[in-house]
Amino acid sequence: MNTTVAEAGIQNHPVVSGDRWLAQRKTLLAREKELMRLHDQVARERRALPWERIEKNYVFDTPDGKRTLAELFEGRRQLLVQHFMLGPDWAQGCPSCSYMADHTDGMNVHLAQRDITFVAISRASLAEIARFRERMGWQFKWVSSSGSDFNYDFHVSFTPEEQATGQVAYNYGKLPFPMEEAPGVSVFYKDDAGDVFHTYSTFGRGVEVMMGAYSLMDLTPQGRNERDVPNKMEWVRHHDRYEPAPAAKPAAAHACCASNG
């Protein structure tokens, strides 16, 4: 059955009685519950995926010196990695990755309570990372994979030779990609013996799991307001580069109020 529903426009949007609104809201609620149950089922299937053992000894530059992947866990069992697009000699990080990262500092205390350490990883030097991190005002841990195969092995950085073919390995397929760096989120687990396992990675739109603002936008009448934008995220800026948001418009006078002027 085709369940596609065309989006109603803001102009001339249907306005109905309270009873009819409630009836349609309950219909949507059933769909929302269906989606939530599917979400829960997919999460169970994600946790049930087999793991792959990390055999390579990845070493990262951190503010505390050289650290292995196992040491990035900081005593916890689970490591959540944002593959942040900030390449060597870049003037600044990717705006979309920055939009993701803007959600991070507030959630880290909660992640730690569930045995999860968060870290961002980029190929830029530690000095380049520190400069951009300070500009953004972020506090989360961010390390450099410079000199390591880590980014290449997890298919979020591409060699000139790979790019020259016109097809790179990204998001579990071969596709054209316009840049040498790509976004992603990866998850790792460390057992009692200290062995590290790769349990999950997501790319492309999968990284929206870190974009909580999108979830709130999806509740509003205009949604993400990206339908007429060729590149859906081209509106995103670094949080210190937005033009001032439009001022709230004064409420229009109701007809009965206007007549009392």
Walk through the language-model features, giving the residues of each:
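Non-globular targeting/processing and membrane-anchoring segments
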Residues: M1-R114, R131-G137, K141, S148-G261
